[in-house]
């Protein structure tokens, strides 16, 4: 590894004797240094508190030619003799040796060895790519190290990623310690695979699974289609803006849950623990975060295990006001359920795309019949893991754990929360149409009038008070849910927050999203009159100021009713005939009127309410098997009423199934997809990604949606 720098007071930079580069204190963020040298005056300036707050545990030396008392946080006093320079260098070397986490440290050392390989992968450290101009460009674009770090498991020095040996095992043990799990498993093909690993390890045909209707499709795939378990669905909330909410409070009542069992498996209704597994979204895509203690206290005694799908969170234990929501911080006993937590590290933590991790917390039930041992879980793990893993992905998970260790993780997320609060305040100050999704008033005082430090430390400033008009969610109990402060959620005009009804004019969020992308800003997702921006410790005040400025600029376009060709040139140029002479407000009005005509907000809400659930007539696994056998036909969604779905259907994002294999098409689900079909034809350029239904252009030039149903 290249030697790191030494940071020093500006007056000392030229006086230090070191082979390392010496940089001034003001020219570093301390991520590139291995030691710090300060003066006595510096020690009184606040630099020691700053260094402590980083959580980097850097060795700090105080340079003084006179005898001084050693301040707290200083390693030693030096005055410039040769022996002391050696001590400084020794401390810097020691810091470097302890800096890297287990697997990544081993990987970097192995790459530096420069071994000659006759094993796969065939590009042989990139040499194959460099034999062609396109390959050379590819190699130069990504850089040498990514090719050198892509290696075969034929060399055992890095350990085994499938049976968890060597430095790979050490890395996962280290992550388990950081995240407060009993065991942690690194998954290299996303939380879609992580969820399937857990559900395949726990569920079999005939098992009951308590199933959040908000669950990501991967949970349907693993629990219902692959394992064949029988679901008991929990209804969930949607609000008029299109935000995904949480499960209704009444669903956590024991008698209610036992009654649900009587409808699908009456022989299990009175068992002490009728559910093998409950699958709950710890945080929804749109930032509704659950109270894990509350979930376990109300339904835990009915379940062998609870899987908290934490794809959209995972950082909650590093943010004090969110810590209560973390299942991994709970004290559990032998009567509690075992806990699994899956996290999409790549979403808002520090990981390459596809990096995920499974946390297992069940030592408190070890020895009981319901306990899932490591070997059983690892059997499912190997069903879904490649035998040719990409080591940089694994290394990223290792480094992510190191970043989150101790004070550094807490500091990084504290800064993220504060930056997000400042961004919300800026939007409230500069924008009239787009509103942050937070309580407008708390204790009779405007949200934005509280100091940022107060807002960042008290969850009540993000809580969903039951019945409050601003959020529009129904069925919540006190202290059940709160808004994730690291999800910057905005609402757009079109919904009267007081009544939940449509207003005369609206600005569908997809139009705003298109405008932002036209101008180099990429939101995470949008739906109806809501838009989401993910916040991570990567953010800066400058980056968010650019977003706020662009929101204000779009509002000016709305006010000026600018020509569409100026606001959305890509859409206009792709469909010049359709949008000729259109203005921005004209497009907004037309799309808003489409939403109103189909009452899309209520259709979306109804799809996740129990009274509107599609009828279940087959086990999802059986319906899927019929699909694989070809015992299906492709029909227009318009004509699908009363037919049994062979595929799950959904818009993506968010990846939540609206109809599940084995359920009957009709009702709100069918009308919702017909509304989408109308939009595809009426408003080209704004079509959503649909999965499980297929848009086909018929002979008359009209696009229609089709889906597979059982014969």
Swiss-Prot record:
Any one of the GO CC terms: cytosol
EC number: 4.1.1.17
Coiled-coil intervals: none
Cofactor(s) recorded in Swiss-Prot or TrEMBL: pyridoxal 5'-phosphate
InterPro entries on file: CheY-like_superfamily, OKR_de-COase_N, Orn/lys/arg_de-COase, Orn/Lys/Arg_deCO2ase_major_dom, Ornithine_deCO2ase_N, Prn/Lys/Arg_de-COase_C, Prn/Lys/Arg_de-COase_C_sf, PyrdxlP-dep_Trfase
Gene Ontology MF: a single term: guanosine tetraphosphate binding
Keywords: Decarboxylase, Lyase, Pyridoxal phosphate, Spermidine biosynthesis
Catalyses which reaction(s): L-ornithine + H(+) = putrescine + CO2
A Pfam family recorded for this sequence: OKR_DC_1
Family under the similarity heading: Belongs to the Orn/Lys/Arg decarboxylase class-I family.
Protein name listed in UniProt: Constitutive ornithine decarboxylase
